[in-house]
Amino acid sequence: MKVWMAILISILCWQSSAWAVCPAWSPARAQEEISRLQQQIKQWDDDYWKEGKSEVEDGVYDQLSARLTQWQRCFGNETRDVMMPPLNGAVMHPVAHTGVRKMADKNALSLWMRERSDLWVQPKVDGVAVTLVYRDGKLNKAISRGNGLKGEDWTQKVRLISAVPQTVSGPLANSTLQGEIFLKRKGHIQQQMGGINARAKVAGLMMRQGNSDTLNSLAVFVWAWPDGPHLMTDRLKDLATAGFTLTQTYTRAVKNADEVAHVRNEWWKAKLPFVTDGVVVRAAKEPESRHWLPGQAEWLVAWKYQPVAQVAEVKAIQFAVGKSGKISVVASLAPVMLDDKKIQRVNIGSVRRWQEWDIAPGDQILVSLAGQGIPRIDDVVWRGAERTKPTPPENRFNSLTCYFASDVCQEQFISRLVWLGSKQVLGLDGIGEAGWRALHQTHRFEHIFSWLLLTPEQLQNTPGIAKSKSAQLWHQFNLARQQPFTRWVMAMGIPLTRAALNASDERSWSQLLFSKEQFWQQLPGTGSGRARQVIEWKENAQIKKLGSWLAAQQITGFEP
């Protein structure tokens, strides 16, 4: 009983974390938003079940359906069953499809497994569920899952799928099987290829009118044999003998959640003959089939893979000014998990790119991880009914602005500080954007090098800077004085690569100021355009003023 309570608490905690933040909508706004999304999902359902086509990726559909359920719970609306098909002309299942409960994580699975024995793991094949009924050794009927109790008659379609045995013998001669009709794949690696909208493709082929040779691109994975042999090994052997070989190949005995996690990770990265979206753990001991009911299976659970892409709600649109003066747009998100990373922000790009995406707070966007784990936007999957977009700042900044602090220069000024403190420039370890903001807010820097004048006492008394860290920071600031001349010039934003600057062999400020355009133009990777930028940079009044200030501080290379 205690274990069951622990499982319940785990599930409730997971659900509450997922549903904790409800939109701050008025009742009228909530009704409008829920109604719009409800209508869209109904349209997708109609397309899926009546036309056999899908206008939306499976993963997006699943996540937006979950979002609708969340909103309905937030505002006391009646929830809907996901993908409930029409029941016109439906056929009763000899044995009900129970569905499978999802485990939130490995801990929840471990609690579930603790009170059970003789457990087995199978891939959660991504396709469309079906009942296969054999009578007197022949395929008698095939029924779509439907609502679990009734489904559509798919017999004629399934008879055209060559991978489904049409005749069986022995224990299966009079049997009812449940499984997944799937799209045959050769070497499908889930980690790399994702879901490829497999479920919708299978549904499309099965719902399409007329017989089609394309049905031979389908096969079946049997995952249940109600009232079959008591021993799982016997069950698997008989299924394999009858032609359902995949079940035996991809069913493994497991003792604990660690073993399940190992197999789950293996199948996530392995070449498989089908698309999967997780694993199913099931007990060999099952109740008699007459007790099977939709939503009431306690002998099996699923542990799904984390989606390659997540639907995230945009909470705010923010603008940032980089050190070069370019304005970039960032979307703040309701947190989502991707590959064990908590994603709360995603870079949209330029203002123009943001306007092309047409993203506003309240919209739902599809986010995935690009190279090196950087979040990216794949699509805008849902736009809110009421959309208010912020006004971007005026484009008054460029590569020669904001070396000196001012109210309008706040963001570019901070970006310059972050840049000069980076490893490739002055290498000021232990301070990032938050630290620079704290220092500037307290000590009101005049320009980007004002931090050189801070005393140990000032650093120690800076709110937001730990006292234990202030001495280390002062030491870093003093060490910066010993950095080579070229590093300081880079900190000043000279429009050259480090390689070009090193090739110039410039070792003093006075030498640099007297160098002509032709000199800069001959440097590797520079060219006439970049050379003119260097001339414009070194003749800028703010740059000259900074050079004089560094000379007064006796920084190497700037002395008269």
Curated annotation (Swiss-Prot):
EC identifiers of the protein? 6.5.1.2
Alphabetically sorted, this entry's keywords are: DNA damage, DNA repair, DNA replication, Ligase, NAD
Q: Into which EC class is this enzyme placed?
A: ligase
Active-site residue numbers: K124 (n6-amp-lysine intermediate)
Q: List the disulfide bonds.
A: none
Q: What's a single GO MF annotation on this record?
A: DNA ligase (NAD+) activity
Catalytic activity, per the record? Answer: NAD(+) + (deoxyribonucleotide)n-3'-hydroxyl + 5'-phospho-(deoxyribonucleotide)m = (deoxyribonucleotide)n+m + AMP + beta-nicotinamide D-nucleotide
User: Can you tell me which family this protein belongs to?
Assistant: Belongs to the NAD-dependent DNA ligase family. LigB subfamily.
What name has this protein been given in UniProt?
DNA ligase B
Question: What is the native source organism of this protein?
Answer: Escherichia coli O81 (strain ED1a)
